[in-house]
């Protein structure tokens, strides 16, 4: 029985998952001909920013500060940066993010489909999501179709409209997410603040025109997170402002840019239509 399940899982990974794997597309774009204008961060940037012609979005969901810093350094190792958007969101310093080191990230960017004995089941990111794949496979009648659109500029655009959900659902979802994003004391953030600062310093020394951006979240999420730990969040926002002043960068706080729930796919991410709508305005706000 175990061998049958393993064989079926390997088949699904090869025929359904790998052909539409966003990470492979993301790595291929990262390793393509480099440009001087780019954006970096996690899913808030990946799903919420559609870059203009000539700029690429190199953000990837759940990316930690050490991995983002490695990526920025690697990308601009052999060419000069120009306009660079760097995510500046408080949740990047939440405890659940403070254990994610660089690890094998560089190796994944060299070969995103590296596997043992040629088995896709041996690829960690696939193995970690295997239960979710099977659940989705069963729920959708044997079909596995990603709803994410990976654009030529690197954005990972998502459908969804949280305004269609009942108010109680939105409030509970926001509170659950806010608890995950709750910040610990500043002392626990020290090492990651230093990594973040060094990333900005290195970019600044290379002549980058840096814009630090706090990305939009829904009004439900803003309310929920303030009730949990407003003081620590204010400390992070002060840190972002101080860093921007230190390197003479632009800091744009767009956390509350919109109260229209139809702009959000879930409680703290813009949907694809909103990303397309707001991105040109953000570029103007950042760089004129």
Language-model regions, residue ranges each:
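Active-site segments of SGNH/GDSL-like serine hydrolases
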Residues: 200-228
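Secreted/periplasmic serine-hydrolase-like ester/acetyl group-modifying domain
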Residues: 101-211
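Histidine-centered active-site loop/cap adjacent to the catalytic His
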Residues: 266-288
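Short extracytoplasmic
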Residues: 28-54
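Membrane-embedded segments
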Residues: 44-129
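Alpha-helical transmembrane signal-anchor/signal-peptide segments
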Residues: 12-33
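Substrate-gating cap/lid alpha-helix
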Residues: 219-252
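Hydrophobic membrane-insertion alpha-helices, especially the h-region
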Residues: 1-11
């Amino acid at each position: 029985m175990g061998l049958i399940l393993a064989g079926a899982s390997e088949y699904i990974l090869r025929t359904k998952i790998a052909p539409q794997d966003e990470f492979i597309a993301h790595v291929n774009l990262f390793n393509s001909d480099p440009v001087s204008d780019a954006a970096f961060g996690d899913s808030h940037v990946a799903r919420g920013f559609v870059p203009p012609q000539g700029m690429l979005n190199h953000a990837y969901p759940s990316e930690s500060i050490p991995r983002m810093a490695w990526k920025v350094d690697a990308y601009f190792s052999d060419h000069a940066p120009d306009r660079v958007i760097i995510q500046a969101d408080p949740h990047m310093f939440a405890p659940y993010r403070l254990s994610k080191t660089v690890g094998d990230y560089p190796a994944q960017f060299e070969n995103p489909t590296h596997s043992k004995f040629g088995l896709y089941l041996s690829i960690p990111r696939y193995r970690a999501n295997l239960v979710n794949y099977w659940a989705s496979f069963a729920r959708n009648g044997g079909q596995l179709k990603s709803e994410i659109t990976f654009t030529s500029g690197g954005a990972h655009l998502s459908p969804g409209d949280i305004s269609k959900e009942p108010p109680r659902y939105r409030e509970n979802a926001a509170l659950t997410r806010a608890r995950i994003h709750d910040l610990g004391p500043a002392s626990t953030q020290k090492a990651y603040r230093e990594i973040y600062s060094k990333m900005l310093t290195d970019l600044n020394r290379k002549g980058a025109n840096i814009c630090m951006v706090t990305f939009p979240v829904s009004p439900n999420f803003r309310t929920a997170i303030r009730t949990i730990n407003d003081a620590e969040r204010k400390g992070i926002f002060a840190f972002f402002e101080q860093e921007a002043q230190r390197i003479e960068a632009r800091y744009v706080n767009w956390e509350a840019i919109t109260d229209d729930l139809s702009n959000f796919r879930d409680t703290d991410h813009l949907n694809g239509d909103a990303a397309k709508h707001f991105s040109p305005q953000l570029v103007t706000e950042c760089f004129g």
